[in-house]
């Protein structure tokens, strides 16, 4: 791909070897085109080693003339590959290195990890019933990579989360969650029929680990870990407690649990502060 100057998709270069990396750096430093520069930044980010990080850091401090025609700095390009760096060039990991998917089971199963459970509480803004949109059992050996020895619950108003900037929770490892204050909407578009259907889904977690990019190129596969299938641009929210970038945890495509729904719910986590943030993207 590099020899033929194929720079899309950037995932082609994920963890590429030093020889490929050096060729990308050479091309990046020589280009005068913002379009080629943008693609090469993404490819180099996917390589993701120490030398690649150093080049991206240097380009943020001393940008090329074509940078003025791009929307974001090189550290944001690094986010496409699931990492970034701070002002001191300290590496920040934004994704997990394992991936599991949800698949259709024979029956509804609320033991362990599952999607969508009604909470029996109403949204203070629109009156829609609140849901635990994801319950994740970190004690399951499949999720040992999360480093969370307990049950994590992500809760939201399914109506408001699709029409607002997002909803955050504070969680405890006994499965409880506190929905933090959020800006909602007055109109409720969810009927009881929709909510019941959502809470009756038969999705269960896969027994086998999936490839890291398993969910990145499918808009009908719900995943935990790995890389997301961003509908718009990749987006890593800041933790409302500590202000640091949150890690991507999971994605749920609405049409897998709700007929004719559009868009995707992305779930991110700050393990240190025990904060979950959920937000919606759609075309």
Task: Mark where each language-model region is.
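Preference for intrinsically disordered or flexible, low-complexity segments
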Residues: 1-283
């Amino acid at each position: 791909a590099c020899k033929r100057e194929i720079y899309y998709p950037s995932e082609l270069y994920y963890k590429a070897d030093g020889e490929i990396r050096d060729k990308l750096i050479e091309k990046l430093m020589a280009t005068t085109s913002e379009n080629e520069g943008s693609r090469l930044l993404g490819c180099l980010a996917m390589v993701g080693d120490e030398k690649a990080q150093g080049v991206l850091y240097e380009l943020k401090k001393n940008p090329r003339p074509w940078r003025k025609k791009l929307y974001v700095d090189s550290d944001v390009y690094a986010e496409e590959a699931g990492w970034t760096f701070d002002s001191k060039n300290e590496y920040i990991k934004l994704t997990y290195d394992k991936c599991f998917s949800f698949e259709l089971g024979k029956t509804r199963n609320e033991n362990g990890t599952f999607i969508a459970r009604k909470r029996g509480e109403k949204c203070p803004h629109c009156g829609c019933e609140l849901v635990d949109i994801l319950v994740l059992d970190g004690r399951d050996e499949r999720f040992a990579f999360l480093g969370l020895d307990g049950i994590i619950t992500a809760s939201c108003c399914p109506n408001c989360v699709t029409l607002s900037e997002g909803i955050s929770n504070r969680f405890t490892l006994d499965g409880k969650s506190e929905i933090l204050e959020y800006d909602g909407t007055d109109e409720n578009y969810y009927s009881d029929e929709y909510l019941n259907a959502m809470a009756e889904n038969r999705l269960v977690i896969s027994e086998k680990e999936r490839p890291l990019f398993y969910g990145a190129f499918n808009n009908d596969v719900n995943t935990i870990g790995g890389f997301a299938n961003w509908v718009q641009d990749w987006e890593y929210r800041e933790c409302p407690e500590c202000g640091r970038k949150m890690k991507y945890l999971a994605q749920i495509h609405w049409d897998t649990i709700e007929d004719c729904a559009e868009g995707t719910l992305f779930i991110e986590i700050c393990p240190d502060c025990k904060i979950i943030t959920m937000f919606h993207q759609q075309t």
